[in-house]
Amino acid sequence: MLKLIIPSIMLIPMTFLINKKSLLWTATTFFSFLIAALSTLTLNMDVAEHNSTNPLLSIDQFSCPLIMLSCWLLPLTIMGSQAHMKTEPITRQKTMISLLILLQVLLCITFGASNLLMFYIAFETTLIPTLLIITRWGNQKERLTAGLYFLFYTLSASLPLLLALIMIQTHLNSLSIYIIPLSNLTLLLNTPWSETLWWIACFLAFLIKMPLYIFHLWLPKAHVEAPIAGSMILAAILLKLGGYGMIRMSSLFIPLTKDLAVPFMIIAMWGMIVTSSICLRQTDLKSMIAYSSVSHMGLVVAGIFTMTPWAWSGALAMMIAHGLVSSGLLCLANITYERTHTRSIFMNRGLKTLFPLMSFWWLMMTFANMALPPFPNFMAEILIITSLFNWSNWTILLLGLSMTLTALFSLNMLIMTQHEHPNKHAPVNPSTTREHLLMLMHMAPIILLIANPSAIMI
């Protein structure tokens, strides 16, 4: 862990010591790629299930793939932000890159924390750089409203979680995620309603972060108003903090979760259908991708609450695969927006004739979003759907309708943007090597996961 955290921290002063604009982006991208490559070598969990570097930090089969994803996304966000930031003064460019690096450090600490209080502190601290990125570098004035939604939705559930953790510390004198399961937490409470309140306090912060349908209103606003780097990190990593926290907490509340999670599972599956239907009516590309994320994360919520090994493996695989695919789709939407200056699907028709090479990446990312075989999304959905069907036969109706709607809006997005008659645009610049490399770096891990899916299996 420290092999990743310390070099990442040292990237921040290095960023401020570089004075040339051309060297700034090249150097930070190169060194962040080195850290990402280092993560694939150091975070090898084939030998042991648990590897602790100190009492506060450790990695296991849940945290290892998510830390690797966090490290991999940093150079991609830096590459994706170059065109957006080139007109800014060099001081603001350095500030933006430093915030992205700080966010990676906080995410690595969050996923690697073995103490729940340290996990909570890092989990909440990720809010600060994300909020700064959205409110400072967003395009429209609505970014301030989006920042407020993001802030208050996240903070509203933070205090109950902190109180629940303090209560655990008071009774057990420990917040280690490896010691708490050895004791029965349910014996600490005397009444059923207090057990219910305690369980909700522990899970509400993560359900909002996922976000569960009914708590999702902050996500489309934040996605649409954030710059490309903010959108990529939000979709690829920050939503996964909720899933990771739910997996950690579920292992601590096994008897309670099986009894209390049923309403949230039903809401999650119903939310998949509703958000997929909303995607069919969306005209904004980024908003469509945001609602698509709510739909996919609803499947993860339902899978985690079944409390089966298959579902947890599928949830982890879905979080990794969705992180890469949604980030890739947002990059494609941003590449189009930088040339046509609109996110409307109706204004961005017939892009295949304008950017013939980019249409290949649109095709691949759309198929992955639809969870077609052999993409890892397909494997993840099969594992989760099998577990949910084993939990209740009636879930096949909700899940079948949701999968159909997902395929419909994904194909609608692909056909409308690529195969319709093109609108009359002002002359646009062709796609660049940097943009194709950016998409290749999204696609490469997906191809590797197709070849070796056991890398993200529990």
Curated annotation (Swiss-Prot):
Protein's UniProt keywords contain Glycosyltransferase: no
Presence of keyword Thylakoid: no
Reactions this protein catalyses: a ubiquinone + NADH + 5 H(+)(in) = a ubiquinol + NAD(+) + 4 H(+)(out)
One Pfam entry name: Oxidored_q5_N
EC number(s) per entry: 7.1.1.2
Domain of life (superkingdom): Eukaryota
InterPro entries, per database record: NADH4_N, NADH_Q_OxRdtase_chainM/4, NADH_UbQ_OxRdtase, ND/Mrp_TM
Record's GO cellular component terms: mitochondrial membrane
Listed GO MF terms: NADH dehydrogenase (ubiquinone) activity; ubiquinone binding
Bilayer disposition of the protein: Multi-pass membrane protein
Transmembrane regions: 23-43, 59-79, 99-119, 148-168, 174-194, 197-217, 227-247, 260-280, 289-311, 315-337, 355-375, 396-416, 438-458
Keyword annotations from UniProtKB, A to Z: Electron transport, Membrane, Mitochondrion, NAD, Respiratory chain, Translocase, Transmembrane, Transmembrane helix, Transport, Ubiquinone
A biological-process GO annotation: electron transport coupled proton transport
Localisation: Mitochondrion membrane
Function statement: Core subunit of the mitochondrial membrane respiratory chain NADH dehydrogenase (Complex I) that is believed to belong to the minimal assembly required for catalysis. Complex I functions in the transfer of electrons from NADH to the respiratory chain. The immediate electron acceptor for the enzyme is believed to be ubiquinone.
Annotated NCBIfam families: NDH_I_M
Protein family according to the UniProt entry: Belongs to the complex I subunit 4 family.
Annotated protein name in UniProt: NADH-ubiquinone oxidoreductase chain 4
Organism of this sequence: Petromyzon marinus
Gene field: MT-ND4
